[in-house]
Amino acid sequence: MEDAFRATVEEAIEERRQKLHQLSRFLWENPELALEEVKAHNYLTDFLESEGFSVQRNYLLPTAFRAEYRGKAEPGTNVCPTVAVLCEYDALPDIGHACGHNLIAECSVAAGIAIKEALCKYSTLPGRVVVLGTPAEENSGGKELLIRKGAFKDVHVAMMAHPGKRTGLKYAFTATLQLTVRFFGRTAHAGSSPWDGVNAGDAAVIAYMNISLLRQQLKPTWRVSGKSISARRPSVYLMTSGPLKGRSRTP
């Protein structure tokens, strides 16, 4: 039976090879930032609808979507085992799809179609497949927003693929927490009475340095990064420039 499933999956994807490649190229050539993925949303939902999925556009978020194909329920129940394939499609500022979200979208759509074809061919197989469009992965935490809005409440298994240097299966992931920290001080004239002030910039620099020094005690799977709040790129990327502005007064 496993060989038959594999053959069905391979055939479904091979038949659509060119269309799937065109999907990836379209996203590559039309990069859109987090929560602005209008072209990607429209292309992907039209594509999945043409493949027989029931599509909810603008699902819980303006550029999210849910494309579903439902097979039969478990015998004697109304429960339908549900697999969600997560589809990412937002790009990065300045460098477009350097993180490969065009490929993630292609893989997710291909996987969703392959599962749908298996459910169609093997009608006794219970199950439902959902291709869930999850915008804003690079910034704004799109999946977290969807979780909070209940997008995963009827999902039993969620999976996705990410391009990398090697092929492998990863079943555990690191959680992420994004913080914005602001330091507040008290202003004073730096030339005539600096002792009357409290420099919030000093506090920010010391905090950054202490966190950086802490890295030598962090385990290899732990990551901490930061950026200036004026930097354009997300904090997960190292800063390529670090502007400082100051003044020197000497006799």
PLM region spans:
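Acidic/His- and Gly-rich active-site-bordering loop/insert found
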Residues: 2-129
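Histidine/acidic-residue-rich, glycine-tolerant segments that coordinate divalent metal ions
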Residues: 65-66, 73, 90-98, 102-103, ...
